[in-house]
Amino acid sequence: MLEELNAKEKYSFNKLQKRLRRNVGQAIADFNMIEEGDKVMVCLSGGKDSFAMLDILMSLKASAPIHFDLVAVNLDQKQPGFPEHVLPEYLTTLGIDFKIVEEDTYAIVKEKVPEGKTTCALCSRLRRGILYRTAQELGCTKIALGHHRDDILETLFLNMFYGGKLKSMPPKLVSDDGKNVVIRPLAYCKEKDLVRYAEVKAFPIIPCNLCGSQENLQRQAIKQMMQEWDRRFPGRLETMFTAIQDVIPSHLLDHKLFDFKSINRDSGIIDGGDKAFDPPELPKAPLLDIDEMDMLDVIEVR
């Protein structure tokens, strides 16, 4: 599709491509996601996000100041209608190391989950276990997942509204089995950017609902809420994402994170003190993602 773009569309896509590369590079640097000598297992589901993650990581690898290896891994869960040929053919054309793991988790899920109920939770747990095992077999030091900024915010709201926790998706963590380090290189990337990137790149997308299951109602409601906010209040999601990167425990209520009991008159003013009755200090404009590429000359996309 790239060759079908006109000059204006190519300019726009060039900005998008640079923005996504910058976002991924910044996340990797901020959280020390990839280090010298790492072997990164890139989990490829066949969706837009994992395709984009692989594409961007391959691009960054070519110019990175450190050496690391990539291996793409797809789990064929034997869902009815899964096009087995698509990913091997695509990955072969890229010239990247890859492995297709075949495990009939679909049969297990259909046996365990009542008809009409969402299978996503059990399917996800089974998939994680297989991927963790595969990472060990391949000698991988990091496992890269394709969750993006919107996934992180959705999870934050799900935990707040339905779980009573201020908790989201970490950009980097130790896996459930304690043997793997999991990273999310797309943590700073907007979903709408990834959608457009996948469209232009014409990735061979495989639907994620071949099993017939759908997201649970709570996640659907959160997604719709965020889409409405983004439409009606431009910049709100950007501001909220900035907020979870600037947490002040002394101004929350979790005594496990801050020692409120020890505070006395000699403690001094902590983190600005109590400004509850002061006029709110709000920015004059939303914290929009201003792209410095707007100020540069047009660069031809080849």
From Swiss-Prot:
Binds 1 [4Fe-4S] cluster per subunit. The cluster is chelated by three Cys residues, the fourth Fe has a free coordination site that may bind a sulfur atom transferred from the persulfide of IscS. It catalyses: cytidine(32) in tRNA + S-sulfanyl-L-cysteinyl-[cysteine desulfurase] + AH2 + ATP = 2-thiocytidine(32) in tRNA + L-cysteinyl-[cysteine desulfurase] + A + AMP + diphosphate + H(+). Its EC number is 2.8.1.-. It is found in: Cytoplasm. Its cofactor is Mg(2+); [4Fe-4S] cluster. GO terms for molecular function: 4 iron, 4 sulfur cluster binding; ATP binding; magnesium ion binding; sulfurtransferase activity; tRNA binding. [4Fe-4S] cluster binds at residues 120, 123, 211. Gene3D superfamilies: HUPs (3.40.50.620). It comes from the Bacteria. Pathway: tRNA modification. GO terms for biological process: tRNA thio-modification. A motif (PP-loop motif) lies at residues 45-50. The thiolation reaction likely consists of two steps: a first activation step by ATP to form an adenylated intermediate of the target base of tRNA, and a second nucleophilic substitution step of the sulfur (S) atom supplied by the hydrosulfide attached to the Fe-S cluster. Belongs to the TtcA family. Catalyzes the ATP-dependent 2-thiolation of cytidine in position 32 of tRNA, to form 2-thiocytidine (s(2)C32). The sulfur atoms are provided by the cysteine/cysteine desulfurase (IscS) system. Homodimer. This is tRNA-cytidine(32) 2-sulfurtransferase. The gene is ttcA.
